[in-house]
């Protein structure tokens, strides 16, 4: 029996299949532009130009990667969607740095390292030591503020503190809690600090010009017991002269973190603001001591909105905290209240509608739909 005419035509099309025929057969449109390597003559590969060195190949590959294409790459297709709304930058302006001066300093440092015979010998023998303090200082001076900004974005600090506005923490803020007599618990960007370690006010240091004024606050983003969008103010120092934190005005005394039991991990953030002039914070002052949680209810967005004309966020440091035994003491002795305890209640398990004849199902299948908790298995 002869094959139908449409099958013969389909076989003939498949024999000469190209982009246009594939588009017709698969109900797709042809590509919007030239495909990769479409300009290469595959019939005569010997006549293609050879790179003959890796540097020429790398330069050519970089040019091809940076050239505009009509298609999207894998990362562009599956990458994170960018926010169409531009975020407002409320921080300090970036410092003016001469690119020529940077290149000269870098070239001079390379020349000094090459001329240092001892360093070369130590590197060759693998006995060289790297000064970590100098590395950290260089990191904080160059790319560290942008890394901190990315971490704060990841933990949702800008979203919850400033309603989406962002800033680059230009001023390195160093916070450390004293643990015992000799040990310190530093605060970086998201490390975990227990309430026991944060029982006393920390030591805060930063670099500041003489004659400048600063404001330092510590707030808990996830600890409010009544209002989900409110915070608890743990510490507020205002009109700090220079970097002498101890001489600042104690607008709100320090209160240790008290994450409730069963409420998970809480975020606590230190914010450093640079003031343009002395500010009257009498409306934001709390009594000392202040152990009423209603008086410590706080919103960073409203606080900054009130004083945004005279101060600018400049530094940021934050940590995570969860419940331990010292929180019970804070609730009972300091706050003079019963300690709240939370428990995660899981939703009931979902079971599909019971089948009258559960074919190939075990006997335990009936336990899902019984009113009693007595198991079916083991009784026969």
Swiss-Prot record:
<comment type="subunit">
    <text>Component of the mitochondrial large ribosomal subunit (mt-LSU). Mature mammalian 55S mitochondrial ribosomes consist of a small (28S) and a large (39S) subunit. The 28S small subunit contains a 12S ribosomal RNA (12S mt-rRNA) and 30 different proteins. The 39S large subunit contains a 16S rRNA (16S mt-rRNA), a copy of mitochondrial valine transfer RNA (mt-tRNA(Val)), which plays an integral structural role, and 52 different proteins. mL38 is located at the central protuberance.</text>
</comment>
<dbReference type="GO" id="GO:0005829">
    <property type="term" value="C:cytosol"/>
</dbReference>
<dbReference type="InterPro" id="IPR036610">
    <property type="entry name" value="PEBP-like_sf"/>
</dbReference>
<dbReference type="InterPro" id="IPR035810">
    <property type="entry name" value="PEBP_euk"/>
</dbReference>
<keyword id="KW-0496">Mitochondrion</keyword>
<protein>
    <recommendedName>
        <fullName>Large ribosomal subunit protein mL38</fullName>
    </recommendedName>
</protein>
<dbReference type="GO" id="GO:0005739">
    <property type="term" value="C:mitochondrion"/>
</dbReference>
<keyword id="KW-0175">Coiled coil</keyword>
<dbReference type="GO" id="GO:0032543">
    <property type="term" value="P:mitochondrial translation"/>
</dbReference>
<dbReference type="InterPro" id="IPR008914">
    <property type="entry name" value="PEBP"/>
</dbReference>
<dbReference type="Pfam" id="PF01161">
    <property type="entry name" value="PBP"/>
</dbReference>
<keyword id="KW-0809">Transit peptide</keyword>
<feature type="coiled-coil region">
    <location>
        <begin position="99"/>
        <end position="127"/>
    </location>
</feature>
<feature type="transit peptide" description="Mitochondrion">
    <location>
        <begin position="1"/>
        <end position="26"/>
    </location>
</feature>
<keyword id="KW-0689">Ribosomal protein</keyword>
<keyword id="KW-0687">Ribonucleoprotein</keyword>
<dbReference type="GO" id="GO:0005762">
    <property type="term" value="C:mitochondrial large ribosomal subunit"/>
</dbReference>
<comment type="similarity">
    <text>Belongs to the phosphatidylethanolamine-binding protein family. Mitochondrion-specific ribosomal protein mL38 subfamily.</text>
</comment>
<dbReference type="GO" id="GO:0005743">
    <property type="term" value="C:mitochondrial inner membrane"/>
</dbReference>
């Amino acid at each position: 029996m002869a094959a139908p005419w449409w099958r013969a035509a389909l076989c003939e099309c498949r024999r000469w299949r190209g982009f246009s025929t594939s588009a017709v057969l698969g109900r797709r449109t042809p590509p919007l532009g030239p495909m990769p390597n479409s300009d290469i003559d595959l019939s005569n590969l010997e006549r293609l130009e050879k790179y003959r060195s890796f540097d020429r190949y790398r330069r050519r590959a970089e040019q091809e990667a940076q050239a505009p294409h009509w298609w999207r790459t894998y990362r562009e297709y599956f990458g994170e969607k960018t926010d169409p709304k531009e975020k407002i930058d409320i921080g300090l302006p970036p410092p003016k740095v001469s690119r020529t001066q940077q290149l000269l300093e870098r070239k001079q440092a390379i020349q000094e390292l090459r001329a240092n015979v001892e360093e070369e010998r130590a590197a060759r023998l693998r006995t060289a030591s790297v000064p970590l303090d100098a590395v950290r200082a260089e990191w904080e001076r160059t790319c560290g503020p942008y890394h901190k900004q990315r971490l704060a974005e990841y933990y949702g600090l800008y979203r919850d503190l400033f309603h989406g506005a962002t800033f680059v923490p230009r001023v390195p803020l160093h916070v450390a809690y004293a643990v015992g007599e000799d040990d310190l618990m530093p605060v970086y960007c998201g490390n975990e600090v227990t309430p026991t370690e944060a029982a006393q006010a920390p030591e805060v240091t930063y670099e500041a010009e003489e004659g400048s004024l600063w404001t330092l606050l510590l707030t808990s983003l996830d600890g409010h017991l009544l209002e989900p969008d409110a915070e608890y103010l743990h510490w507020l120092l205002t009109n700090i002269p220079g970097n002498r934190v101890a001489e600042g005005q104690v607008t709100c005394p320090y209160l240790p973190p008290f994450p409730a039991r069963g409420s998970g991990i809480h975020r606590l953030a230190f914010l450093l603001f640079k003031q343009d002039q002395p500010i009257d914070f009498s409306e934001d002052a709390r009594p000392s001591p202040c152990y009423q949680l209603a008086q410590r209810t706080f919103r960073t967005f409203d606080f900054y909105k009130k004083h945004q004309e005279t101060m600018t966020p400049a530094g940021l440091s934050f940590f995570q905290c969860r419940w331990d035994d010292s929180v019970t003491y804070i609730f009972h002795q300091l706050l003079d209240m019963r300690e709240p305890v939370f428990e995660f209640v899981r939703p009931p398990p979902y079971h599909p509608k019971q089948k009258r004849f559960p074919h190939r199902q075990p006997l335990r299948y009936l336990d899902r739909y019984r009113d009693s908790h007595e198991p079916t298995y083991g009784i026969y």
